[in-house]
């Protein structure tokens, strides 16, 4: 939980909620703020499992997962490849389409579209709501 990304605060909230829920179920929990170099602390703790509550860069992109795998520590969350891939929305869509998984219409919003965004949306025939 915690970490270095801009989502540090929400990561703490997630981590605390998960920690509390696990404790209520009788699990022994050690909370770890994954900021800076935390590998030595992981080695000392020798966890049976890491519940990954990190958000954003480093937590969801495969970085922490690769550290845990290199230390042979099991973890919750998608693996390194799936996590990294999920951060690239356009590439994920291409893979989904290739595997016949339905995806909504989309276009990549560029900074240069700022002046004519309504025209771009109309040209692409994308209807509201837009995410």
Question: Where do the model's predicted regions map?
Answer:
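Glycine-rich, highly charged phosphate/nucleotide-binding loops
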Residues: 27-46, 58-59
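Glycine- and acidic-residue-enriched helix-capping/strand-helix junction motifs
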Residues: 1-15
């Amino acid at each position: 939980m915690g970490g270095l990304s801009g989502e540090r605060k929400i990561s703490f909230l997630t981590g605390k909620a998960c920690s509390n829920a696990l404790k209520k179920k009788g699990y022994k929990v050690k909370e770890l703020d994954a900021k800076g170099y935390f590998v030595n602390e992981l080695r000392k703790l020798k966890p049976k499992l890491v519940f990954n509550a990190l958000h954003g860069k480093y937590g969801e992109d495969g970085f922490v997962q690769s550290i845990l795998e290199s230390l042979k520590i099991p973890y919750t969350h998608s693996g390194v490849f799936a996590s990294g891939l999920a951060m690239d929305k356009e590439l994920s869509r291409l893979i989904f389409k290739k595997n016949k998984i339905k995806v909504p219409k989309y276009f990549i919003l560029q900074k240069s579209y700022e002046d004519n965004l309504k025209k771009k949306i109309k040209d692409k025939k994308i209807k509201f709501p837009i995410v």
